[in-house]
């Protein structure tokens, strides 16, 4: 039951992000997608205005597995710095339960993964960006809130709600 509940929560979070993508399309914003699971983080979709490509990549995004959070935050910082050089401030949304358990060197360790993730979060917080951490855990987790606080971002526990309700919460939390 917990596995199917987690998949349902991920589906609702993806639905909310899809609604957010539609808003970005209307404003002609660029969007990018970074997946972080198992051994590494990967830029699946470089910054683009293509809503169709973004939706396809989001739909195919799997959940579960190990979490190389630091590497994902490093990629996010790199994109934020590039955006800053172009005179823009990047906004990002992170869907996570906050359980960083892969260190930068690839070691599977919750302690090292968390330490590396928080160090990467401190660096990202200094970039021209603003962020939102959506806690996808069944129950709100202190580690996801700590990540949001370190990022100087907004924390939002995934409510038991549909994508529309979550999208309204995201809109309220992001500029």
Model-derived segments and spans:
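Short beta-strand-loop
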Residues: 6, 29-60, 80-83, 106-108, ...
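N-terminal-biased segments
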Residues: 72-80, 92-107, 111
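C-terminal helix of von Willebrand factor
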Residues: 147-175
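N-linked glycosylation sequons
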Residues: 66, 71-78, 85-86, 122-125, ...
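Helical mechanochemical/support elements of P-loop NTPase systems and associated helical scaffolds
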Residues: 6-9, 13-16, 50, 54, ...
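VWA/integrin I-like adhesion module and closely mimicked acidic/polar interface patches used
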Residues: 99-150, 156
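Von Willebrand factor
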Residues: 1-47, 71-75, 88-95, 131-140
């Amino acid at each position: 039951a917990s596995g199917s509940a987690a998949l349902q929560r991920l589906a609702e979070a993806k639905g909310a992000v899809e609604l957010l993508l539609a808003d970005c399309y209307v404003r002609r914003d660029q969007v990018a997608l970074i997946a972080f699971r198992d051994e590494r983080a990967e830029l699946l979709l470089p910054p683009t205005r293509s809503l169709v490509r973004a939706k396809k990549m989001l739909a195919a995004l799997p959940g579960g597995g190990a979490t190389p959070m630091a590497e994902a935050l490093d990629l996010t910082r790199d994109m934020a710095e590039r955006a800053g050089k172009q005179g823009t401030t990047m906004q990002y949304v992170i869907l996570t339960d906050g359980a960083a358990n892969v260190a930068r060197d690839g070691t599977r360790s919750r302690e090292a993964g968390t330490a590396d993730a928080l160090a990467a979060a401190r660096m990202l917080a200094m970039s021209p960006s603003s962020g939102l951490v959506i806690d996808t855990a069944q129950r709100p987790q202190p580690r996801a809130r700590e990540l949001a606080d370190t990022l100087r971002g907004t924390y939002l526990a995934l409510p038991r709600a549909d994508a529309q309700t979550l999208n309204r919460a995201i809109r309220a939390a992001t500029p």
